[in-house]
Amino acid sequence: MSEKVFKGVEIVGTSDQSFSQAIEVAVKRARQTLRELSWFVVEEMRGGLQSGGLEYQVTLRVFFKLDSQDKADSEGTLV
């Protein structure tokens, strides 16, 4: 059986359209930086009051798989 280890990081996405779009914005950006994203958890949803409108804000914890220990050992660092 393959053993896996995951790490979670907190990010915040915003949108002037909807909570769903704020989530999509956050996940899209995380995919540009983090490899092997596996899942996310919505930690908090809130709204900002802007002059003339609303800002939807969503705090997410996104989880990604850490590289295998063998690969980390050969490179000297854990990615």
For each of these PLM feature ranges, what is it?
Residues 2-40:
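Short, well-ordered alpha-helical segments
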Residues 41, 45-79:
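A cross-kingdom feature marking charged/low-complexity
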